[in-house]
Amino acid sequence: MFLNKYISNYSRTRAVSCAPVLSYKKCSYRNFNGLLQARFQSNNLSWSNRNRVVYKSFQPNPRDKRFQWIFGALIAGGGVYYFTHLEYVPISNRRRFNDVSLDFEKRMAQDAYKEVMSEYGDRMLPSYHPTTLYVSRVLKRIIAVSGMSDLKWELHVIRDPTPNAFVLPGGKVFVFEGILPMCKGEDGLAAVLAHETAHQVARHSAEKIAFTRAVSCIVFLAAASLDLSGQLSHFLLNFGLLLPFSRKMETEADYIGLMLMSQACFDPNAAKTLWERMDAAEGQMGKALAFASTHPSSKKRIRKIEEWLPEAQVKRETSDCYHETWPMLQSFKEVHW
């Protein structure tokens, strides 16, 4: 990364236009830890020798030209690769870059599933437990409208007071008992499950892998060319790119989840009241700097949900929830468990 050598001969020194003199000082440079240091050496040239100096710094360097061709080819190839891996996110219709295959995502999810089971396996409620049946009843309605009923969904309710829930790629759903009191009923639980299901619908896990790989390469090249320290480039990568990207995905999952729960005939207003309770429960713990968080603040989420509520209400009304409840319930049989 650093160039640690002296440029001591005149042919590799940048030429400076000046009036004819019998003696001059030339500069040789050394790049050391990002600082440009110069030392001056006195050299006496006769007037007759002045015209013999060849300013090679003004002559084209074949190596530089070859580097430009290689760099240009990489940029062009990267552009083609980027545009050929663009796709649209379901429901939100956001266009994004994603080069992670379903098989790779599946392998990653299997490893994550093993880790979760090894940590919480002894605290899983049985499938016939009333709490598991309650969560399953709500989740089935969300899955029925998600467009992903063909997955082999698995629900695990964990006996743990932590208010948490998540879905792994492939339909592995984990719900902690601690989230249930905060939901205050099926509509609130639907808001949680729809949000987590939305991450699966949008394939956010795969997109995050693709985004991280791409921006890591860009930051590495920028750090090398600008001579940035490792800590600074790491700071820029995380706080300037990865964390804002994570908050963007969470916001998108809020939107997709709100549409899903509305289409499944749950009350979308429950999503707003859920985050109001979350905001109150966070207290001082929720006062952390926004730029250092992977999730938007509860207040920001509430404001966005308020913007989307009219659309969500229309989605619910067009789903004809009051006349087609039983046909939709019958469709649950088609979901694979």
Curated annotation (Swiss-Prot):
Protease activity is induced in response to various mitochondrial stress. The active site is at residue 196. Gene3D superfamilies: Metalloproteases ('zincins'), catalytic domain (3.30.2010.10). It comes from the Eukaryota. GO terms for cellular component: mitochondrial inner membrane; mitochondrion. Zn(2+) binds at residues 195, 199, 250. It is found in: Mitochondrion inner membrane. PANTHER family: METALLOENDOPEPTIDASE OMA1 (PTHR22726), METALLOENDOPEPTIDASE OMA1, MITOCHONDRIAL (PTHR22726:SF1). Belongs to the peptidase M48 family. This is Mitochondrial metalloendopeptidase OMA1. It comes from Schizosaccharomyces pombe (strain 972 / ATCC 24843). The lineage of its organism: Eukaryota, Fungi, Dikarya, Ascomycota, Taphrinomycotina.
